Structure formats: structure tokens, C-alpha cells
Amino acid sequence: DGNVIEEVSGKDLPPLKGKDIAVHPDKVTYVARKDGYVIFDENKYTIDIQDVLVIKGNVNRLYGNVFYDGTVRVKGNVGEGAIISAKGDVIVEGYIQSAYVSAGNNVVVIGGVNANDSGYISAQGGVYAEYLENAVVYAGQDVKANYILTSRIEAGTEITVKGSKGVICGGELAAGCK
């Protein structure tokens, strides 16, 4: 099934260039010199190791769980049932919905959090979001949002609500929990 074709001599590719990589003596294998996320640029023919894992879409149950030793940046949303755990920061450019997010440093949500009383956000540093609705949040330091609705928040230092609305409505909040 199929046609047999004559082999054609290929062209050797030049070795890849990049930061934080070493070329194995076989000149085919590349080894990272540090922990991180591998970035291959086909146009520049380079390979780099970055401390930030950039996810260019949404994280959800179909995408799979994310466990990373550095910082995780999600360019989309974090959907229901998703799990993200990072030793650095977790930065979400969209919103978080009923997910489990933990960070060794800060959690920053450019959009907001609507957890529908499911999931949690936990950070050894601070938690910063546009809004927190029906969320469970544990922060080793401060929590800042424009408004907080019916959420359970524990902050190591302080809870700040800012912006023109600056509302806290319902829920349980505790600050200075270090």
C-alpha cells in the first residue's frame, strides 16, 4: 500500500542558537541549562528557555492541568474545573471561573473571578483582580479588587476595595491572618 520512492539526500541544518541551552556531543540533542519553558522560533532558528510559561488561549479541563516551577501567564480565561499551580506568579489576562489556582507568589487577574462557590484561589503573595464574586480566596499578603460580592476572603495583611464602585457585599472577609 503506497509507492516506494527513491531516497533523496537531505541538507544538514546548522546548530540551533539560543539562551540557556547546551548542545550534546552528538550535535543533535539540546539540553536546558536551567528549569523553564522551551521556546522554539522557526523563523530565527533559535531555542530559548524562559522562566514564564505563556499560554496563548484558555485553560480548561480540555486543555489539561498546568503545574509549573516559574510564572504562568494565561492570555485567555481559566474555565470551570481547571487547575493551575505555579511556584511564581499566575497572571490571567481574562477571567477565572470555578477553577483551582495556586501561586507561590501573586495571582493577578486582569478580568475578574466568578467562582460560583466552587474552586479557590490561593497565593503566598497577594491576589489582585478586577472583581471577586462567589470566590474563595486565601492570600499570604493583601487582596485588592474593585468590588467583592458574596466571597470568602482571607488575607495575611489587608483587603482593599478600590475604584468608583468600591463595594463589599455579603460573604466573609478576614484580614491580618498572618
Where are these regions (language model features)?
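Phosphate-interacting basic helix/loop segments used at nucleotide- and nucleic-acid interfaces
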Residues: I159
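Charge-rich, low-hydrophobicity low-complexity segments
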Residues: D1-A155, V167-K178
